[in-house]
Amino acid sequence: MKIISAVAASSIALGAVSATTDHVSRMLVLGGAVVPSGTKTYTTGIRPTIDGDNFCGGSLISPTHVLTTTACLRGIKPPNWVSVGTHYLNGTHDGEQIKVVAAQNHTNFNSTSGSFDVALLTLEKPSRFKPVKLPAADDSDIVAGMWSKLVGWGYTGYPEKTKAYELQGVSLQVWDNEQCGQLYPVDDTMVCAGGVKGKDSCDGDTGGPLIKERGPGDEDDIVVGLVSWGSECGVGYPGVYSRVSKALEWINSITKGK
């Protein structure tokens, strides 16, 4: 996820920072708890090697496609493998590890504004795990004030950078875009969530899912956002997530050939 300093975020609120402010990637589940093993199995780790550490997160949205963000495709580490259905940061203890055969960014991605910060990975073979549901195109699955859940393997401590070995989750409240726009230069391809000090995403979670839970199990979970950018980890500002509903046409053009 990309980071704007707390000072810069305050300046944005005062109109002192332009909409072209640079963003810095984030990757952490701060203030969360371990997700029970065997749940949220659509959550995907992106790795350079079959048993290496996940450096980004993603979501299995079809048997052969993982949804993530563009930073995960252009970093130092190559997105060569995904871990699906695993509870752990690395290794081959559980779940499955599948080779990535293609990776592409949204055709409308804007690296300056961060708009359409969405990417897709195509897998060498189908996953046996059930994909997460995609949101409705009319944005009805994401409403200001609702609670959502961020899931990932990012740092659990900041600035000491304590790594999460097990999958973590934290509940975050969704903001109205107009309200969030007083802090950040956001547009309708983004959604803000969080804002409680000590509960946030940061280093390690980039690309991972922001989920709308619709029941006690995972069957009806919907991926409404993807970890994209924000202020320094856990300082009390919301994180900014890619709004998945705005990318559905592009996603379907690849996963369904439409």
From Swiss-Prot:
Query: Which interval of the chain is the signal sequence?
Result: 1-19
Q: What does this protein do?
A: Secreted effector that suppresses host plant glucan elicitor-mediated defense responses. Targets host endoglucanases and inhibits the endoglucanase-mediated release of elicitor-active glucan oligosaccharides from P.infestans cell walls.
Quote the subunit structure annotation: Forms an apoplastic complex with host endoglucanases in tomato leaves during P.infestans infection.
Disulphide-bonded residues: C56-C72, C180-C192, C202-C233
Q: For the Peptidase S1 domain, which residue ranges apply? A: 29-256
A Pfam family of this chain: Trypsin
For this record, the Gene Ontology CC terms, alphabetical, are: extracellular region
Localization: Secreted
**Record's keyword terms, sorted:** Disulfide bond, Glycoprotein, Secreted, Signal, Virulence
Under what name is this protein listed?
Glucanase inhibitor protein 3
Does the keyword field hold Disulfide bond? Answer: yes
Q: Which organism is it from?
A: Phytophthora infestans (Potato late blight agent)
Tell me yes or no: is Signal among this UniProt entry's keywords.
yes
* MF GO annotations: serine-type endopeptidase activity
Tell me which residues are glycosylated.
Answer: N90, N105, N110
**Of which family is this protein a member?**
Belongs to the peptidase S1 family.
**Induction annotation:** Expressed during infection and the expression levels increase with disease progression.
Name a single GO biological process: proteolysis
